[in-house]
């Protein structure tokens, strides 16, 4: 390949790259005049001072529960799972109005033993009054490496039909 031909190849590749970036950037443009419907609610909490609910998260977005060790984060998360699985109001506080086409809940725990994860799920079942919820899939990932956990979480998210709610208890 001659010097000029090599130079032309590089310029062509740069031009392609610039064109692809331009197209991608344009596809991300937010049009202020476009009518965009609000996202569907994934979960919300009842306001103590009224009958109104405060949005905690919408479909397609991430929410994070953060707190000190032993501050009952897992308890709160299990209430959220109960709300998502049952579609009911949990402890007169939390609800998750998931539609039937987004009603599957996947729960990963990365810290607890299989025994303790099962106990947590049994508490959820007791709370919602259902023996075995058909829309809850639970996985204990403690024994796996972080890279294995990530692969399995991604796989489950990509391959669970009608997925509406994902919980990962114990991300570091």
What are these regions (language model features)?
Residues 99-172:
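Conserved inter-motif catalytic segment of the P-loop NTP-binding fold
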Residues 1-16:
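Interdomain "pre-motor" coupling segment immediately N-terminal to P-loop NTPase/helicase cores
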Residues 13-124, 131:
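The Walker A/P-loop phosphate-binding site
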């Amino acid at each position: 390949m001659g010097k000029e031909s090599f130079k032309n190849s590089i310029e062509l590749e740069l031009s392609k790259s610039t064109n692809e970036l331009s197209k991608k950037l344009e596809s991300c443009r937010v049009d202020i005049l476009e009518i965009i419907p609000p996202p569907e609610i994934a979960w919300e909490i009842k306001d103590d001072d009224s009958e109104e609910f405060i949005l905690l998260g919408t479909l397609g977005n991430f929410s994070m529960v953060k707190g000190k060790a032993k501050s009952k984060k897992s308890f709160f998360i299990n209430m959220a799972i109960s709300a998502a699985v049952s579609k009911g109001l949990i402890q007169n506080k939390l609800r998750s109005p998931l539609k039937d086409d987004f009603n599957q809940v996947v729960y990963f725990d990365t810290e607890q033993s299989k025994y303790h994860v099962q106990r947590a799920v049994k508490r959820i079942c007791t709370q919602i009054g259902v023996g075995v919820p058909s829309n809850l899939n639970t996985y204990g990932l403690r024994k796996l490496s972080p890279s294995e956990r990530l692969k399995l979480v991604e796989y489950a998210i990509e391959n669970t039909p009608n997925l509406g709610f994902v919980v990962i208890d114990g991300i570091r």
